Amino acid sequence: MEYDDMLDRAMEETPEIDGTSERFEVPDPDIRQEGNVTVYENFQSTCSRLGREDDHVMKFLQNDLGTSGHIDESGRVRLTGEFDATRIEASIDEYVDEFVLCSECGLPDTQLEREQGALLLRCEACGARSATSE
């Protein structure tokens, strides 16, 4: 049997994989308005999925959205001003690009660490280390 024939046969016998090709997905923000306050209901689950501290993500959101806010006793974020889910999601996506995904291999298997006062992103998958904008 020729190589090309064996390759064709193997490709025919390989089952198709259903589902998404990405293993890392950030939950869509669950947002609701309370007057002039935007409440981010699933903030805790988002931070858990990102593997980052709540305070760090909150600080980024405040800076990116140009507003003030706090984390309430239920773990929800309360931001001053009206922000829709699309704007919050865009801000979280920026956070992921800057502080979660490795700049070399693109995987989310990273940790934030401080070295000589600088905040670095260390990838556990490829070993790369890169400076963040913080």
Curated annotation (Swiss-Prot):
Database matches in SMART domains: eIF2B_5
Entry GO MF terms: translation initiation factor activity
Protein's name in the database: Translation initiation factor 2 subunit beta
Gene3D superfamilies linked: 3.30.30.170
Job of this protein: eIF-2 functions in the early steps of protein synthesis by forming a ternary complex with GTP and initiator tRNA.
Keywords attached to this entry: Initiation factor, Protein biosynthesis
Presence of the UniProt keyword Protein biosynthesis in the record: yes
Superkingdom as given in the UniProt entry: Archaea
Similarity comment: family membership: Belongs to the eIF-2-beta/eIF-5 family.
Keyword Protein biosynthesis: yes
Phylogenetic lineage: Archaea, Methanobacteriati, Methanobacteriota, Stenosarchaea group, Halobacteria
